[in-house]
Swiss-Prot record:
GO terms, biological process: D-glucuronate catabolic process
Higher taxonomy: Bacteria, Bacillati, Bacillota, Bacilli, Lactobacillales
Pathway: Carbohydrate metabolism; pentose and glucuronate interconversion
Record's catalysed reaction(s): D-mannonate = 2-dehydro-3-deoxy-D-gluconate + H2O
GO MF annotation list: ferrous iron binding; manganese ion binding; mannonate dehydratase activity
Identification of the protein by name: Mannonate dehydratase
Record's function text: Catalyzes the dehydration of D-mannonate.
Family assignment from sequence similarity: Belongs to the mannonate dehydratase family.
Keyword entries, A-Z: Iron, Lyase, Manganese
SUPFAM superfamilies per the UniProt record, alphabetical: Xylose isomerase-like (SSF51658)
Taxonomy, superkingdom: Bacteria
Spans traversing the lipid bilayer: none
Length: 366
């Protein structure tokens, strides 16, 4: 297992040097952020990003993400041209030696929360989705701009896209469009040596009358059966799935491990109920997920992928503007999961490797 960390490129206030100092940190999860959605990523942009990361003593373990254009999700006539661009991006990621691409097929937005600074009992704040905050709210009728929505669209464009989904695209239509996309890109991913890892809907249930399809166990089974290849896998985001209390994330994790289809791990903890959900500290007791049991499954199945501590609380005066992506709590999460990994590896009679090549600098002989 390679511990990895999300980094938003040169504009990220969290630096590669700070990330490198986290014990056992090996990988960077990032993307090319200066190419518009729908256009192909040039190889030189990817190689420039890779060089920057490697000069800091890290490696890019996952691209998160190559965004899927809304016209592909909606099955519009221009989707084939957009898919060709997507395939070019996959080829170039593979040519750069990066093994995994995380992506999603969520309509309109990547994630939705109603509060970015909801208080927790320990005095910190975190991201929350409170259904009561959104009761009666209509993103088409109201002047609404929630976190996680694609800012590249104007409000009028956003409203038109939402209305098109509501009027013309059912969940089965979205499944059909996803299947079309998967069957088009997976042969390219296989040839390029890139494993694809779809992220679940966040939250994993319907909101605002929009179709949601990557939501739980049955959806994962259906998705994996669309294209039977280890290159067609999932991002097992335990926090996203656990945001719906109906989901048994341990059973889901083991199911996907048995099929060797977890291509990326996100480990955030949440507490959830009929009221919605709130993200918590990573510690098992802080939320609803037995994180030790999750890591034990990864060890039991000799999982070799990349894991990143997903989202963090705002603690210790962290002023990072990107919600959930401050340095401090994610660094705590990384060391926590590395600790769980080492304990479970040693209990299994195995020796963990955190990629540490030197224990000090220079010679110490007199």
């Amino acid at each position: 297992m390679k511990m990895s960390f999300r980094w938003y490129g040169k504009k990220d206030p969290v630096t590669l040097e700070e990330i490198k100092a986290i014990p056992g940190m090996q990988g960077i999860v990032t993307a090319v952020y200066d190419v518009p959605v729908g256009q192909a990523w040039p190889l030189e942009n990817i190689l420039e990003l890779k060089k920057m990361v490697e000069e800091a003593g890290l490696e890019i373990t996952v691209i998160e993400s190559i965004p899927v254009h809304e016209d592909i999700k909606q099955g519009k006539p221009n989707r084939d041209a957009l898919i060709e661009n997507y395939k070019t991006s996959i080829r170039n990621v593979g040519a750069a030696g990066i093994p995994v691409v995380c992506y999603n097929f969520m309509p309109v937005f990547d994630w939705t929360r109603s509060d970015l600074h909801h208080p927790l009992p320990d005095g910190s704040t975190s991201l929350a989705f409170l259904k009561s905050d959104l009761a009666g709210v209509d993103p088409v009728a109201d002047d609404l701009n929630l976190p996680g929505w694609d800012s590249s669209y104007s409000k009028e464009e956003m409203k038109a896209i939402i209305e098109n989904y509501r009027q013309n695209i059912s969940e089965e239509d979205l499944w059909a469009n996803l299947e079309y996309f998967i069957k088009a890109i997976l042969p390219t991913a296989e040839e390029a040596g890139v494993k694809m890892a779809i992220h679940p809907d966040d939250p994993p249930y319907g909101i605002f009358g929009l179709p949601r399809i990557i939501t739980g166990q049955e959806a994962v089974e259906r998705f994996l059966n669309l294209y039977d290849s280890e290159h067609n896998g999932i991002t097992m985001c335990v926090g996203s799935y656990a945001s719906d209390p109906k989901n048994d994330v341990l059973a889901m994790t083991e199911y996907a491990l048995k099929r060797n289809r977890i291509n990326f791990m996100h480990t955030r903890n949440v507490t959830a109920g009929a009221w919605g959900f709130q993200e918590t500290a990573h510690l098992s007791q802080a939320g609803d997920i037995d994180m030790n049991a999750v890591v034990k499954l990864l060890v039991d199945y000799d999982w070799q992928g990349s894991l990143r501590p997903d989202h963090g609380r705002r603690i210790w005066g962290d002023q990072t503007k990107t919600p959930g992506y401050g340095l401090y709590d994610r660094a705590l999460g990384a060391t926590y999961f590395n600790g769980l990994y080492e304990a479970n590896m040693r209990a299994a009679g195995k020796t963990p490797d955190f990629g540490i090549k030197a224990k000090t600098v220079g010679t110490k002989e007199g």
